[in-house]
């Protein structure tokens, strides 16, 4: 996995940056994605995540993660052999992640991991709006977190 991680406001320390990078690589292996798969994660604060949520999802509130998947359509050009595939971008608000960790009574690392895996699965076509989709996504999310060692 080729991950671009942006933290212009230094919302997290190097230890947490490393956790994100390692977890994304682990997720890529769990889903058997090609090694040259690309994505980005941008860490933002409450004001920015609320603005993005309002502008792109028409929801005027903060949230922990917003995903923008790059989905292939019939008009897309086929990838050349060895060419990287970009699956999309995540915007994560560590401040909201920290509040969720406190609300749920577990570590910030576990909640950050949950948020990264959850967003990663969305970038790969998983969803949880319909019960039948949720029945696939949530167990996979739990399986990945447990295999990585991030349990409640």
Curated annotation (Swiss-Prot):
GO biological process terms on file: rRNA processing
Subcellular location as annotated: Cytoplasm
Q: What is its EC number?
A: 3.1.-.-
Under the heading InterPro entries, the entry gives: MetalPrtase_cat_dom_sf_prd, YbeY, YbeY_CS
The EC class name is hydrolase
Details of cofactor binding: Binds 1 zinc ion.
UniProt keywords (A-Z) are: Cytoplasm, Endonuclease, Hydrolase, Metal-binding, Nuclease, Ribosome biogenesis, rRNA processing, Zinc
Cite a single Pfam family from the UniProt record.
YbeY
- GO MF: metalloendopeptidase activity; RNA endonuclease activity; zinc ion binding
Name the protein family.
Belongs to the endoribonuclease YbeY family.
PANTHER family (alphabetical):
ENDORIBONUCLEASE YBEY, CHLOROPLASTIC
Query: HAMAP family attached here?
Result: Endoribonucl_YbeY
Which purpose does this protein serve, as stated in its record?
Single strand-specific metallo-endoribonuclease involved in late-stage 70S ribosome quality control and in maturation of the 3' terminus of the 16S rRNA.
Official protein name in the record:
Endoribonuclease YbeY
- Biological source species: Lacticaseibacillus paracasei (strain ATCC 334 / BCRC 17002 / CCUG 31169 / CIP 107868 / KCTC 3260 / NRRL B-441) (Lactobacillus paracasei)
